Amino acid sequence: MQEKAVVLDDQMIRRALTRISHEIVERNKGVDNCVLVGIKTRGIFIAQRLAERIGQIEGKEMEVGELDITLYRDDLTLQSKNKEPLVKGSDIPVDITKKKVILVDDVLYTGRTVRAAMDALMDLGRPSQIQLAVLVDRGHRELPIRADYVGKNIPTSSEERIEVDLQETDQQDRVSIYDK
């Protein structure tokens, strides 16, 4: 797998997350009834960063949850090859019923991860609204899902892969395109 290009560096990621934070505050007229829920793994770190920025903007701490969608994926049998899935568990510190839940993920591609996340959320409560924030939207949707907040649209071919590196897991912040 060969890297073709770095499409977002650390400064570009920082700016995109700051913009998304402002958009979340503006669209929801504040964040009083909102909860950020990151989809494991990188979505959690992006959600935490958004919460930090929103806290600076609004002067309020925002609740952040972690969502494990392992058992909700429709491609589980394709990935597992007769192995038991590794379930890490979800941790959402508040009742999401009647709250605006902002799902957060690193890359939006086919929409299947988001569909699985919505199924998992509905098992935990009944939010008044679900919104979606992603760092990168690369297109190629298989389901009718659209992000409400996008850091960067990066059109790709199906022969390319987007990789998001974050300081928390990869010791650097960047988004790259690779040939498969």
Swiss-Prot record:
It catalyses: UMP + diphosphate = 5-phospho-alpha-D-ribose 1-diphosphate + uracil. One of its GO terms (molecular function) is uracil phosphoribosyltransferase activity. Transmembrane segments: none annotated. GO terms for biological process: DNA-templated transcription termination. Disulfide bonds: none annotated. Homodimer and homohexamer; in equilibrium. Belongs to the purine/pyrimidine phosphoribosyltransferase family. PyrR subfamily. Regulates transcriptional attenuation of the pyrimidine nucleotide (pyr) operon by binding in a uridine-dependent manner to specific sites on pyr mRNA. This disrupts an antiterminator hairpin in the RNA and favors formation of a downstream transcription terminator, leading to a reduced expression of downstream genes. Also displays a weak uracil phosphoribosyltransferase activity which is not physiologically significant. This is Bifunctional protein PyrR. It comes from Bacillus cereus (strain ATCC 14579 / DSM 31 / CCUG 7414 / JCM 2152 / NBRC 15305 / NCIMB 9373 / NCTC 2599 / NRRL B-3711). The gene is pyrR.
